[in-house]
Amino acid sequence: EFMVLARFLDQAGRDKSAPLAGPSTLSQLSGFFGYNNFLPNDAPNGNAEQPAAPVTLPISQILGLPNDLRGGVTGPCPYLPVKPELLKRWQDALSEFSKPWIGIAWNEAQPGLTLDTLLPAIRSLPGTLVSTVWDHSRRQLSGHQGIIDAGAHIKRLDDLAALLHALDFVVGPDGIILHGAGAAGTPGLVIAQYMSPWYWYAETDRSLWYPSMDVLKAPR
């Protein structure tokens, strides 16, 4: 959800010193976007530290407005921060492999989308498959040849952001990788649940919030 919100923060008329409140798990991500005044609302007495807020409207409720009232989404995109030196490092590292460079992501276990479930649908694609997974889910790569294990070199969000900017396409389930690809303006396909969250709302299969992303919903 924060990755969607980050697209519009600069348009709120406040500088990056403005406080942001939310779960403590988002503190690193908010800092990545340059908002370092983060107030965790799930910490002891966390709510007491938060400034009084005016009338609020959750972004998800915007989708309930009529189209002519809601209007279009006009926030800037791409907006995922990237360090040029890291982007060049990924581009140089991948340059020996055929394009397009297709980033892939998967879930840790079923009933999520595992690598074994995803691969039959993408093996015939041209170019090079590049794993973007950096946690223990990388173990699913064992026994699969021909996939570049870029995740082994991802140590922080800066590395992931630069990789997502370097790739030509990204495919996988709902998660930070697909949100990041959308924020980077990288074309991609998210494989979402049939009753997908509001942030994967799509009109004619194209994501409302991430213009470069298509949304494929699982059957009922």
What are these regions (language model features)?
Residues E1-R220:
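Catalytic machinery of carbohydrate-active enzymes
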